[in-house]
């Protein structure tokens, strides 16, 4: 019964718990959940789904809705999950350890949702050695699709040749995107 209700929440169909994104900004999500408006420090549509699932689970377990939303509004992103780092010159870096092409695409789509147009998106993509070689070129292609500049690195090469890792990643970089792509070993 619980899993059925939660699956309804995530399907964008009629459900016991409803959520609407009012604003998705770098400062967080402004949402209406079951007619209560609340600000969350997390960003991105995927986090809105996660928040709604947590809310629904807590309510089904008997918690008070206002208390649940208050607690959830104080949540911070896990380290390395769209984590914001700012410097004293007003530059913002978002760190995310996306480790699949789909995850990287979702992160970059999220960032592009709240860009005003003047910012430059520079994406650093590292792939470790002795890991899934098939995703290397796909991650590079995703980075090139959504970014003004791309920096490819071999991260932790382990027993692999760092240059070979970068060669694999460059297979996902089209000829037209090579000028905006930098390799660093």
Positions of predicted regions on the chain:
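A short helix-to-beta-strand connector/capping loop
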Residues: 15, 88-91, 175-182
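Class I S-adenosyl-L-methionine
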Residues: 32, 73, 112, 167-174
């Amino acid at each position: 019964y619980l899993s059925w209700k939660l699956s309804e929440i995530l399907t964008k169909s009629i459900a016991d718990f409803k959520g609407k994104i009012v604003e998705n900004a770098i400062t967080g999500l402004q949402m209406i959940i079951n007619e209560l408006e609340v600000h969350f420090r997390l960003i991105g549509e995927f986090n809105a789904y996660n928040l709604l699932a947590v809310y629904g689970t807590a309510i089904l377990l008997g918690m008070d809705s206002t208390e649940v939303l208050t607690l959830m509004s104080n949540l911070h992103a896990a380290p390395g999950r769209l984590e914001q780092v700012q410097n004293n010159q007003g530059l913002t870096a978002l760190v995310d350890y996306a480790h699949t092409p789909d995850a990287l695409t979702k992160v970059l789509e999220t960032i592009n949702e709240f860009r005003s147009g003047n910012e430059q998106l520079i994406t650093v993509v590292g792939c470790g050695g002795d890991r899934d070689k098939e995703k290397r070129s796909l991650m590079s292609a995703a980075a090139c699709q959504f970014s003004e500049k791309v920096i490819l690195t071999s991260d932790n090469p382990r027993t692999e040749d760092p240059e070979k890792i970068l060669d694999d990643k460059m297979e996902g970089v089209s000829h037209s995107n090579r000028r905006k792509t930098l390799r660093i070993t």
